[in-house]
Amino acid sequence: TSKIVKPALDAVKNGEIKIIPASGEKTYYHWLNNIEPWCISRQLWWGHQVPVWFDKDGNQYCAVTESEAQEQAGSDVQLTRDPDVLDTWFSSGLWPIGTLGWPEDSSALNQYFPTSTLVTGQDILFFWVARMIMMQLAVRNEIPFDTVYLHGLVRDAKGKKMSKSTGNVVDPIDIIDEYGADALRFTNASMASIGGVLKLDTQRIAGYRNFGTKLWNAARFASLNEANFGVSVPTAKETVNRWIVGETVKTLKEVNI
């Protein structure tokens, strides 16, 4: 494991890969420094089938293709392939290159690998992120990305992970039907934090809906009463003010339809 784990540890320690927020590094180091044996086979209907074949005596032959396994065993030996499939996290660990045509030397692989930033949840930092780093370094001797951005997790009002079995799942469609899409957007944007937990409480959503309604009513009142929107605004002189005006104009061009 040291041949696979150590390069992945070093990539973060020496700054090749940056984890944001930095607190995620502690979790990353903990998992890789205390790594346990991993059973990578699963008895599932779908997945990448384990590349191992057996003869009638139980001898096993690991190969990329069946023809290679047959060559190892001999042409007169009857082989049966292992019916198990690879664990999902093992298969997805090769996602950065597997989606780009690897193991072939494709144009897509040369163009898009490695990438720059991976945006993902903090809960799969080890299950997916660390394994992608380990596998790409082992297979390609390259890091798959240079930045890992851990976004927050949306949980229920008590901070518990949403689960169908628990019955605490909040359907955004139901929220939109009751409070409106803008209220849900406002709530998520106002509570967003890097790598944190967003406790989705309908009372908070209702509060932002009411606030948004006040803004809408005020704007509508001004519009109906012929408010003068053409008022002369003094020219910004300070650098920071000119920057604010410039950013506002750019935003208006992008979002004002």
What are these model-predicted stretches?
Residues T1-F229, P234-T235, N241-I257:
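Structured secondary-structure scaffolds
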